[in-house]
Swiss-Prot record:
NCBIfam families found in the cross-reference section: PRK11688.1, unchar_dom_1
Keywords: Cytoplasm, Hydrolase, Lipid metabolism
Lineage of producing organism: Bacteria, Pseudomonadati, Pseudomonadota, Gammaproteobacteria, Enterobacterales
Pfam families: 4HBT (PF03061)
GO biological process, any: lipid metabolic process
A GO cellular component annotation in the UniProt record: cytoplasm
Record has Hydrolase as a keyword: yes
Listed Gene3D superfamilies: Hotdog Thioesterase (3.10.129.10)
Record's protein name: Medium/long-chain acyl-CoA thioesterase YigI
Major subcellular location class: cytoplasm
Reactions it catalyzes: a fatty acyl-CoA + H2O = a fatty acid + CoA + H(+); a medium-chain fatty acyl-CoA + H2O = a medium-chain fatty acid + CoA + H(+); a long-chain fatty acyl-CoA + H2O = a long-chain fatty acid + CoA + H(+)
Signal peptide: none
E.C. number: 3.1.2.20
Amino acid sequence: MSAVLTAEQALKLVGEMFVYHMPFNRALGLELERYEKAFAQLAFNNQPMMVGNWAQSILHGGVIASALDVAAGLVCVGSTLTRHETISEDELRQRLSRMGTIDLRVDYLRPGRGNRFTATSSLLRAGNKVAVARVELHNEDQLYIASATATYMVG
């Protein structure tokens, strides 16, 4: 029998799983700066492997989309799994295994120049089957680099 988690413990576990246990997300160097039921903030540093335009040292569009996807996924999944005061760890893992991105619509607004980037996401709506989030990516100078609307299967 698995441990029973409070909503706060479940949210913490989801954050750790998304950011620190998924190999691709670890490779991106994502850092979870803030995570609440309907808000998440991730940050990461630009690395040579993330450059899509080597002549200008611009962040690859796939890296941008990935960071936006993770940030949006955190709020969609977190809000769904913490609807009740408690959840068993087994149920959390089982439900999480059935959740995933349905659609990710990215607007690349500026070239991804910078050394450090921050993705912030907020929940727009969470239903029984589908959740939607809005995400923004800024660099260390607070330049608005990209935005996304993301839809997730959550039920």
